Amino acid sequence: MTKQETVKHLVGVLSDAQAIVFTEYRGLSAAQLRALRILLRGDASYLIAKNTLARIAAQQVGFNDFAEFLRGPTAIVAVDGDIVSVAKSLRKFAETDGLLKIKGCFVDGQVFGSEHVKRLAELESREVILAKIASVTKGALSSALGLVSAPLSSAARVFVAMKNTF
């Protein structure tokens, strides 16, 4: 792949990504990188490119704020799915492996350091949060239904009692 093709590919990846995480991959073997790519598959792609080409692609997309992360052996994690699950996977891999270092991230147009990625990894997944919201909503709806139906059932009992007495 030529440098122009690499920049074009990076521009496409960066512009389509919901979030971007920067990692240092110094010391990781090819097998470890392959394992990391497999771990991230579906939610993100793990790209390694020359920092100069990544910087050019970032400028073309309009991301000028994360040049600080493009020093040393830097890989780009382009998040297509849930940022929380990607952050959890990266943290788990970094803890297990010990060589992967998270440099920072770019989420919703803002640049954050590695601590933000660690905090994202501590959040519950999107599915768990949605399940909790559904549970709370269901409980509130059940309570509201009980409040509405209680007077109606009381009135029905009064009518049945009146019918039985007359």
Curated annotation (Swiss-Prot):
Pfam families attached to this UniProt entry: Ribosomal_L10
Listed name of the protein: Large ribosomal subunit protein uL10
CDD domains: Ribosomal_L10 (cd05797)
Entry's Gene Ontology BP terms: translation
Summary of subunit composition and partner proteins: Part of the ribosomal stalk of the 50S ribosomal subunit. The N-terminus interacts with L11 and the large rRNA to form the base of the stalk. The C-terminus forms an elongated spine to which L12 dimers bind in a sequential fashion forming a multimeric L10(L12)X complex.
InterPro entries reported for this sequence: Ribosomal_uL10, Ribosomal_uL10-like_sf, Ribosomal_uL10_bac, Ribosomal_uL10_bac_type, Ribosomal_uL10_CS_bac
A GO cellular component entry from the record: large ribosomal subunit
Described function: Forms part of the ribosomal stalk, playing a central role in the interaction of the ribosome with GTP-bound translation factors.
